C-alpha cells in the first residue's frame, strides 16, 4: 500500500518554518518499532526491513516535505523568546483513509536554524524514555503523542557523558503548540496569530468554521481539552516536569516527554525534574500551571477575540478540571453515585497516604479488592498506623454500601481505572541500561507489558520500586 502525505503546514503557514532535510547518523540501525501503531497507520512492514531508512532520516517517502517549525514560549514562567524545533523535523502529514491526518516528526534529526546552542541530536536514553512514556500513557487512555520507531547509532553525542545518538519517530494528529501563537504575538504580528487560529479551526475544529463566534467556541474547547488532560494526569499520578508553554499541545495531548515521572510514594509536592529548583512544575502545581499557560495563550488571541469571551473561557477551566477529576476519582474509589462525603473520604485517604508515604499506584489497585461486607482489607498491611486506616476503612465500607452494585461489578470497574502497572522511572532505567549494552530484550518486554496496564501481574513490574529506583534524578538533557 502506498502511503499518502500532504503539505498543509508548508502550503498554508509559509512563515512558520524552515524547509530542510534530516542529517543521518553513523551506522544507524532500527532497534524497535510499534507494530500495532504501524498497522493502524497502514504502514507496510517492508519499511521496517530495509535498515534505518526513513526512521533514521536516510531517505524520505514520496510526498514528504520536511521542515522545522518555529515557535516561542515561556520557560519556568519567564519569557524565553524564540525557540522552535531545535532537533526535530516534521517529515510530513500522513493522510489516512478516514480523512484525518497524522504528523510524522523525527526527533534527533540534526541541526536546524532553531537549534540555538544545541547539536540537533537526541540520545538513546531520552528516545527510549519518550517511546515508553507515550505508549504507557496511550494504553492508560490518556491523550498523547505516540512513538512509532527508535533508531540508535554509532554517532557520539555529548551530554553529561558521551552517549549514543538516536532518533525517535513521533506521530500525532498535530504538533500545534501554545508557543506557535506566542511567537507571532510577541513579534507584534497579530494577523499571523489569527492565521494560526484559522488553520487550527479549519483542520481540527472544522465543525466551528462557519460559526459567527468561532474563536470563542474554539478557545473554550482548548481550555476544556487542557483541563481534561490535566485531570487525567493527576488521577494516574503523572508529573510532566517541564510544562513550559512551548510544550503545551493545542489539541490537549501530552507532548514532549522529558524528565517526567509517575508517583511512587504519594508525595503531593513531588518534583520529577532536578532542574526545577523552585518546584514550579511539581505534581500538585500542574493544574495551576496549565491555567497560567492558557492565560498566556489567551493573551495572544486578545487582538481579535473579546477579552470578556476569553476570560469566560478561562473561568470554565476549574469546573471542567474538577468535574473530570471528580468523576475519575469516584471511579477509582468504586463509587457509583456522587455523595456529599466523597471528597472528605478521598482527602482523608490522601492525608493518610502522604503521612505514610504509601505507594500511589499500589494503594488504589489494592483498594480495588475491597469487599464491602468484610472488615478485612489487603491494603491494611500497607499502613503503619493501622488504627487510622481502620477508622477510614470503616467509613469507606459504609459509603460503598450506599450504592446498589455487587462486589464483583464494583471491583471490575475499579480495576479498569486503577492500573496495576505504570511506567516507573526505575523500569525505564533498567531497559535503558540494557539497551546501552546492545540488549534490547527488556525494551521490547517492557513495551509489551505497558500495553496491558490494568491486568494483574506477578512480576517485578508491579512491585514496590527498589530503594535505588525511588528517587531517580531526571534532567532535561536529552
Curated annotation (Swiss-Prot):
Cofactor(s) this protein cannot do without: Mg(2+); Mn(2+)
Enzyme Commission designation: 2.7.7.-, 2.7.7.108
Record InterPro entries: adnlytase_SelO, SelO
Reaction(s) catalysed by this chain's protein: L-seryl-[protein] + ATP = 3-O-(5'-adenylyl)-L-seryl-[protein] + diphosphate; L-threonyl-[protein] + ATP = 3-O-(5'-adenylyl)-L-threonyl-[protein] + diphosphate; L-tyrosyl-[protein] + ATP = O-(5'-adenylyl)-L-tyrosyl-[protein] + diphosphate; L-histidyl-[protein] + UTP = N(tele)-(5'-uridylyl)-L-histidyl-[protein] + diphosphate
Nucleotidyltransferase keyword on record: yes
A Pfam family annotated for this UniProt entry: SelO
Signal peptide from the UniProt entry: none
Enzyme class: transferase
GO MF: AMPylase activity; ATP binding; magnesium ion binding
Keyword Cell inner membrane among record annotations: no
Binding site for Mg(2+): 247, 256
Binding, ATP: 84, 86-87, 107, 119-120, 170, 177, 256
Active-site residues per Swiss-Prot or TrEMBL entry: 246 (proton acceptor)
Alphabetically ordered keywords of this record: ATP-binding, Magnesium, Manganese, Metal-binding, Nucleotide-binding, Nucleotidyltransferase, Transferase
Function recorded in the entry: Nucleotidyltransferase involved in the post-translational modification of proteins. It can catalyze the addition of adenosine monophosphate (AMP) or uridine monophosphate (UMP) to a protein, resulting in modifications known as AMPylation and UMPylation.
Protein family (similarity comment): Belongs to the SELO family.
Protein name, entry field: Protein nucleotidyltransferase YdiU
Species the sequence originates in: Escherichia coli O1:K1 / APEC
Gene that specifies this protein: ydiU
